[in-house]
């Protein structure tokens, strides 16, 4: 079951709802998840999107996604799917944040450079 909220400006509500619903139906059909997608300008942060777990982190089911609001439809779709894949990784327990550290399959990768992070490689 999916509980989806979205907010922001300069984005297609229909596209957002369609992508998130498709993803959850395909990859997380037996999980209850709550996802809020906030569309905003992220150029200052030099990112197109990011996702995180809303605490508590134990059995995460509530997520926030921030996504840049000025992208082409194809770039928007690719970015949102990338961030949703991180949601999947957290729900399945592959990616965990504990005690200020980030674990991938039980191994601490807190000091791993972005381009070498296994969860980012998998999400691409």
Predicted features by range, described:
Residues 62-80:
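Short pre-active-site segment immediately N-terminal to the catalytic Zn-binding motif
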Residues 59-62, 89-93:
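Glycine-rich loops and low-complexity Gly/Arg-rich segments
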Residues 78-90, 123:
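Active-site recognition of the HExxH zinc-binding catalytic motif
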Residues 2-59, 63, 73:
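Auxiliary, metal-adjacent structural segments of Zn-dependent hydrolase domains
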Residues 3-7, 67-71, 107-114:
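Short coil/turn segments at secondary-structure junctions
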Residues 74, 90-121:
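Post-HEXXH active-site segment of zinc metalloproteases
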């Amino acid at each position: 079951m999916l509980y989806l909220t979205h907010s922001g400006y300069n984005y297609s509500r229909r596209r957002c709802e369609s992508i998130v619903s498709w993803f959850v139906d395909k990859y997380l059909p037996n999980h209850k998840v709550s996802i809020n997608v906030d569309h905003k300008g992220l150029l200052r942060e030099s990112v197109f999107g990011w996702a995180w777990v809303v605490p508590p982190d134990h059995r995460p089911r509530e997520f926030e996604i921030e996504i840049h609001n000025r992208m082409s439809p194809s770039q928007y779709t690719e970015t949102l799917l990338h961030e949703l894949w991180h949601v999947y990784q957290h729900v399945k327990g592959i990616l965990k944040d504990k005690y200020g550290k980030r674990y991938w399959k039980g191994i601490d990768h807190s000091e791993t450079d972005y381009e070498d992070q296994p969860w980012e490689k998998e999400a691409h």
